[in-house]
Structure formats: structure tokens, C-alpha cells
């Protein structure tokens, strides 16, 4: 059993089944043993997954151009900074060389108290811990994680309540099982408190309210050595765990939605022909993956905020 698994199994045996949010938080973000906190680098060829920047360097250049275009729309350009959520290894920072830059992680670093600029969240929200809800004949219940016979297992928990019940009342999809990302809504509140004037650009894979029918049993997946695995309870701390982003609740958080489109549409709007020609000449397969693989799967949500 993994070290995180030892911790969680002892907790469950002592106190009973735990929320999946607790399980995912420990698996990914335990201070010493979590997937994203260990010395091992999860990114790249030797890791478990690639980000868009790692697949094709032109991605960072194009996103930087998009951000500069947004900066040009603002009157107070001198105070403009970019706050990147989930900065990872900081690959975006060099491309944003002429902009002020602050990297903020899931539980490290803090949002500036008041700033003008852009909040960039590239593949950030999909790695936030989520709650899991199940639709039953008696109503909605929260799924829990139990430990029995030497392994972690799903268990039915109590009826949803509090903020979880409020979310379900507003956004419950037509699905038997689905994820609820309350942490994402908390991050949007932080952004609204901190962003005096500017934009929020979220790039991630996900769905709108109308598209939830495609995922009748939810979207949770784990990743190991570039393979997608459905058993998200196995080997906590050794695998990445993700859930698709529900974009509709983010659009209703109080900011103005400017555009919601595919990542490919965003990149094609930001780029110039010679940049794509150079990228195609350097590595045509990588550019095709960026534009027609990830580019069609990933969504880009651009919002504006002003106090």
C-alpha cells in the first residue's frame, strides 16, 4: 500500500468512510506524500502526462500574445500583471517576459490583494479536489470512500447538505453520478475579491450544463505513465486524479463572460500565419495534436471583471 493509502486507511478504520474530497486532497496534495508534492516530476515524457506547453512550445507564445492583446484593451497598462493559477514548472513565465508575473498554486502562494491584469488558469481547475454525488430514488447522496478487504471502496453516504445541496439544486446534471467542484467556486470568489480590473482566462477540458448527458457516471479519471485509468481509488499518491471542469457554474459566478470556445479557436485567433508555419515545419505532429487533438477537447473561457 502507498504511504498516503496507509494514512487514509487508518483514518477510515478509526472514524468511518470519508468524503472523496478528503481522499483526493490527500492523494494529490499531502504536504510530503501527495502526488504533486513529492520530489518526482509528474510532467513530461518520463512522467504521467503532458501539458499543452510541453507538447508544443508555440502554445506558450500564443497564450502570451493573447494576454498582451487583453493588456492593450486596458487603460492602466503599467500596473498590469499576470497571475497564473497552477503554474507548475513555470513554463509560461518566460513567454510573459514583458508582463509582471505571479505564480499561485493550489495551496501555495497567495493572490495579490488588489491588481489589474489577467488571471490565467491553464489545466488548474481539473486537479482541484471534488465531491462525488449520486442520484437515487430517495434523492441525492454524497458518495464516500471506505476501506475493506485491504482496498479502498466506494460507499453510499448521507443526503447532500449545505453548500453541496445548494449546488445540486442549481446545477445537478441528468447523470447518475457526477462531481461537484466547490473548490473551483471558492477560487472564483478569491479572484473576484482580488481582481480590481481585468480578465480571467480558464483553459481546461470540461463541459457545459447541456453537455452533461455525455457523462452519465461522472468524469473522474486517474493517470499513470500516460495511461488513463478508471479506478481512481487505487494507489493514492502515486497517480494523478482529475475531473472535467463544469463551466456553467463558473460562468454564473458574477464575472462577465466574453467568449467560450475551443482552445484551437483561441490559439488560431491569437497567432499569426508565420508562427504556425514555423511550428509545423519544426514538428507537424505536435502542432496537429495541439490544434486538432487537445485543441478541440480543451475549452477556453474568457471573462472580464471590474470593480
Q: How should each PLM-predicted stretch be described?
A:
Residues 1-111, 115-116, 262-265, 274, ...:
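Rossmann-like AdoMet
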Residues 59, 119, 204:
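Conserved RecA-like P-loop NTPase ATPase core
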Residues 85, 106, 124-127, 205:
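Generic detector of well-ordered alpha-helical packing
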Residues 27, 119, 250:
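A residue-level signal for conserved active-site and pocket-lining positions in enzyme catalytic cores
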Residues 116-117, 198:
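Conserved acidic residues
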Residues 118-121, 126-168, 213-224:
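A mobile, often basic/glycine-rich helix-loop segment
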Residues 162-307:
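Long, Lys/Arg- and hydrophobic-enriched amphipathic alpha-helices
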Amino acid at each position: 500500500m502507498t504511504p498516503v493509502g496507509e494514512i487514509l486507511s487508518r483514518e477510515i478504520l478509526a472514524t468511518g468512510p470519508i468524503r472523496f474530497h478528503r481522499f483526493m486532497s490527500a492523494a494529490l496534495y499531502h504536504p510530503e506524500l501527495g502526488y504533486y508534492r513529492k520530489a518526482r516530476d509528474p510532467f513530461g515524457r518520463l512522467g504521467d502526462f503532458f501539458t499543452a506547453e510541453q507538447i508544443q512550445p508555440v502554445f506558450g507564445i500564443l497564450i502570451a500574445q493573447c494576454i498582451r492583446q487583453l493588456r492593450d484593451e486596458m487603460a492602466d497598462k503599467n500596473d498590469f500583471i499576470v497571475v497564473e493559477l497552477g503554474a507548475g514548472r513555470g513554463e509560461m513565465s518566460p513567454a510573459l517576459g514583458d508582463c509582471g508575473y505571479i505564480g499561485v498554486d493550489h495551496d501555495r502562494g497567495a493572490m495579490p490583494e488588489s491588481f489589474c491584469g489577467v488571471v490565467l488558469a491553464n489545466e488548474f481547475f481539473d486537479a482541484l479536489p471534488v465531491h462525488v454525488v449520486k442520484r437515487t430514488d430517495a434523492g441525492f447522496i454524497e458518495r464516500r470512500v471506505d476501506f475493506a478487504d485491504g482496498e479502498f471502496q466506494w460507499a453510499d453516504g448521507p443526503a447532500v447538505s449545505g453548500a453541496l445541496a445548494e449546488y445540486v439544486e442549481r446545477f445537478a446534471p441528468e447523470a447518475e453520478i457526477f462531481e461537484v467542484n466547490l473548490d473551483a467556486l471558492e477560487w472564483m470568489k478569491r479572484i473576484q475579491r482580488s481582481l480590481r480590473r481585468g480578465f480571467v482566462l480558464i483553459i481546461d477540458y470540461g463541459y457545459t450544463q447541456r453537455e452533461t448527458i455525455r457523462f452519465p457516471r461522472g468524469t473522474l479519471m486517474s493517470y499513470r505513465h500516460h495511461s488513463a485509468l478508471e479506478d481512481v481509488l487505487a494507489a493514492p499518491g502515486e497517480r494523478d486524479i482529475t475531473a472535467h471542469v463544469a463551466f456553467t457554474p463558473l460562468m454564473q459566478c458574477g464575472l462577465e463572460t466574453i467568449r467560450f470556445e475551443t482552445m484551437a479557436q483561441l490559439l488560431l485567433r491569437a497567432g499569426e500565419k508565420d508562427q504556425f508555419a514555423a511550428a509545423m515545419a519544426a514538428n507537424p505532429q505536435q502542432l496537429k495534436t495541439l490544434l486538432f487533438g487537445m485543441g478541440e477537447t480543451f475549452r477556453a473561457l474568457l471573462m472580464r471583471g471590474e470593480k
